Each structure stands twice: as structure tokens, then as C-alpha cells.
Amino acid sequence: AIMRMSGEGPTFDANTECAIAYHHTKYQVEQGTAQLYAGDDMAQDTTPILKPSFRLIADRIELKSKEVTHTQVPGEYATFCGWCVTPKGIIKEPRKLFASLQLAKHIGKTAEVKTNYAHDLAHAYRLGDELQDVLTPDEAAFHQATVRDLVTMGGVDFQWHP
């Protein structure tokens, strides 16, 4: 197998390169498809289409993927490292961001995390009313609660641009 084990030299970079090569060998990736890779994790904003030619070599490749397909509708977007891959761009998963902020409040670490959490939230906040197109009612409630908490804490800027 090509994939490297955790703790070995350039594990992350090697795993990322292998994941990209494997994915593009197995699937037809249309031009304009948004793709994210990190180590052995990946996501894309469209449903992968298996290349017929992959069946000819599949039994000779030890690397196997753990595939999860999402319908790319509110509540069912592909996720990647805590981010939802939506038609409007990436947004931090509202429930996870809310839970992380609540934990920070509980352990007294809000001063250390509020700016980073505001930066994470900014991707969704900047969508304005369009955010309602990509969130479920529950996700919208978590988003609103996180915005409210961060505004109440003060000193945060949701208009941050990466």
C-alpha cells in the first residue's frame, strides 16, 4: 500500500497526494467541481461518477475508499473538516460551531476563541438572507444562537474576509 501511517515523516502530504491520485483514477471529475483534500479525507460538491475503466484495475489496488454520498440539500451537504460544502460556498457546521462555543464558555476560554469562531462564522454570516437557502430550521437556530453569543461577548467582526 502507498498510504503512509501516522507519525511517519511527510504522512499528511503523501496521503493527500495519494488521495487525489486515487480519486481522479477512480472517478470522472468534471471541470469546475469543487474538491477538498486533506490527508486521507476528501469531499466534492457533486456526486462522483465511477470511471468504467477503474473496474479493470480495482483488484490490483490495495487502497480502498470509505465512500459517503450526500444529496447536497439543506441538512445533507458533504462535510469536510467541520465545514459544509454548499452551493453557496463553505460554511462551518452550525451545530458543531455552537457546541464548540458552548464548551469554550463552560471552561472559560471564550476570550481565546471568539475571534477565530467569528472568522469561521463569517462565511455563513456574509450570505445574509441567502443563508436560509442552505440551512435547515434547526441549523438556522444554531447559527442564530452562535451569532447572538458572539455579539454579546463583543469585539468580533463577522465581515472578515479571508
From Swiss-Prot:
It comes from the Viruses. InterPro entries: DNA/RNA_pol_sf (IPR043502). Its EC number is 2.7.7.48, 3.6.4.13. RNA replication. The central part of this protein possibly functions as an ATP-binding helicase. It catalyses: RNA(n) + a ribonucleoside 5'-triphosphate = RNA(n+1) + diphosphate; ATP + H2O = ADP + phosphate + H(+). Keywords: ATP-binding, Helicase, Hydrolase, Multifunctional enzyme, Nucleotide-binding, Nucleotidyltransferase, RNA-directed RNA polymerase, Transferase, Viral RNA replication. Belongs to the potexvirus/carlavirus RNA replication protein family. Disulfide bonds: none annotated. GO terms for molecular function: ATP binding; ATP hydrolysis activity; RNA helicase activity; RNA-directed RNA polymerase activity. This is RNA replication protein.
